[in-house]
Design a protein with these regions (language model features):
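N-terminal accessory interaction module
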Residues: 3, 7-9
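Exposed extracellular interaction/assembly regions and N-terminal maturation sites
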Residues: 3, 15-111, 125-126, 135-147
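Short aromatic-acidic-glycine turn motif
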Residues: 109-119
Length: 147
């Protein structure tokens, strides 16, 4: 799996780093590789693959809470070169039925800023949510709802 960091803490913000060792693949340098996205159903603690895959396809059959990894486990899942202010995105797409709302909850040392709910596909509003996770210090992350 490849996750691309949006920023690296440098003021110019031009450096993009991959979570895995850079393969030298030109397509990867332009935007990464998206394989078949991981999935989730009912209430769960997300795995590293679900959090860092870029896209998570959800099919809950009822109201569900998806809890992030703890800050310590999330940092362990990322590459060794992660720095303060590095970021990665997670898009949750909710394909659940009417009323099957997902709430993203932060594990220990992970805070959510903005709306943490991803409404069902039948709702009048978006049934997906994009969260930008930013490392603030060792083993600590903030997830911003950006879309």
């Amino acid at each position: 799996m490849t996750v691309q960091f949006i920023g690296d803490g440098n003021p110019d913000g031009t450096i993009l780093q991959n979570l895995e060792a850079i393969r030298g693949d030109a397509a990867e340098r332009r935007g990464g590789v998206l394989t078949t996205p991981p999935t989730a159903t009912g209430t769960t603690t997300l795995t590293a693959a679900q959090m860092t895959g870029g896209v998570l396809v959800a099919t809950p059959a009822a109201v569900a809470t998806y809890t992030t990894l703890t800050g310590t486990l999330l940092e362990a899942a990322l590459h060794d070169d992660i720095d303060d202010d590095d970021t990665f995105d997670l898009c949750i797409i909710n394909l659940g039925g009417a009323g099957d709302i997902i709430t993203l909850a932060g594990g220990t040392d992970v805070s959510i800023i903005g709306s943490a709910t991803v409404d069902d596909a039948g709702a009048d509003i978006n049934s997906s949510g994009v969260f930008r996770f930013r490392r603030t210090t060792d083993n600590t992350f903030v997830a911003y709802r950006i879309a």
